[in-house]
């Protein structure tokens, strides 16, 4: 198992900031002073259907890998930690959305509209989920397989895409990334996957060993 250094959260944050800096580096409003509405663009790689492909594709691949590999290998353990991570991030993001009630840029040009009934812009649940999925893998393999950092491109893409379709403000996607990364760090450092501990033993063995 890779050494768990305290530098991992910092490195993850730096990597996303580098990727998103050109996109968010503009004066605006909101809690960080960077929120501003982008011109609507639902075309090309930014199409909503492509966003869904990344989101649900990553989730399906993650769950499929966990079920197939079980908990007996390094990769399988990381997959189950990732499942824990995405569940925690998804539940927390949904609770925060309901609590903060922030209007989306598609509904208002004012990023300071909070606590509105039915509004759920903050934080970005999709960025949180994708970040939560990849973080355990990045933490586990970052030292012996540095290319794993390339997975950070997935939440970076989704963050930009969500802003382009006016679904989120800049601070929404940054908060989503922070939430997902924190969930992933918790799941990976905990060691034993929570969800796996309440499932029948066959899930820990994995389908590849069960047939």
What is each model feature region?
Residues 67-70, 141, 185, 189-194, ...:
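Outer-membrane beta-barrel proteins
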Residues 2-13, 49-53:
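Bacterial N-terminal signal peptides that target proteins for export
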Residues 26-123, 127-163:
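Hydrophobic alpha-helical bundle signature of multipass membrane enzymes
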Residues 200-211:
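Outer-membrane beta-barrel "beta-signal"
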Residues 126-130, 168-188:
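Alpha-helical transmembrane segments that form the membrane-embedded catalytic/substrate-binding core
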Residues 96, 194-198:
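Membrane-embedded beta-strand positions of outer-membrane beta-barrel proteins
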Residues 132, 136, 182, 206-208:
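Outer-membrane beta-barrel architecture
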Residues 20-24:
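N-terminal signal peptide c-region/cleavage motif recognized by signal peptidases
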């Amino acid at each position: 198992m890779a050494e768990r250094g305290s530098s991992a959260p910092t490195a993850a944050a730096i990597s996303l900031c580098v990727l998103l800096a050109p996109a968010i580096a503009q004066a605006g409003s909101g809690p960080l002073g960077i929120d501003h509405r982008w011109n609507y663009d639902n075309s090309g790689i930014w199409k909503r259907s492509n966003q869904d492909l990344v989101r649900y594709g990553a989730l399906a691949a993650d769950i499929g890998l966990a079920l197939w590999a079980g908990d007996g290998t390094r990769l399988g353990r990381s997959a189950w930690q990732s499942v824990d991570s995405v569940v925690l991030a998804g539940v927390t993001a949904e609770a925060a959305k309901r609590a903060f009630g922030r209007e989306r840029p598609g509904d208002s040009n004012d990023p300071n509209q909070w606590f509105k009934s039915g509004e759920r812009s903050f934080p970005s649940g999709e960025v949180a989920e994708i970040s939560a999925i990849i973080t355990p893998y990045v933490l586990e393999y970052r030292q012996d397989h540095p290319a794993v950092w390339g997975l950070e491109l997935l939440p970076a893409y989704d963050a930009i895409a969500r802003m382009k379709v006016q679904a989120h403000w800049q601070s929404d996607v940054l908060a989503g990334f922070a939430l997902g990364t924190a969930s992933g760090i918790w799941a990976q450092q905990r060691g034993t996957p929570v969800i796996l501990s309440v499932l029948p033993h066959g899930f820990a063995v994995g389908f590849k060993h069960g047939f």
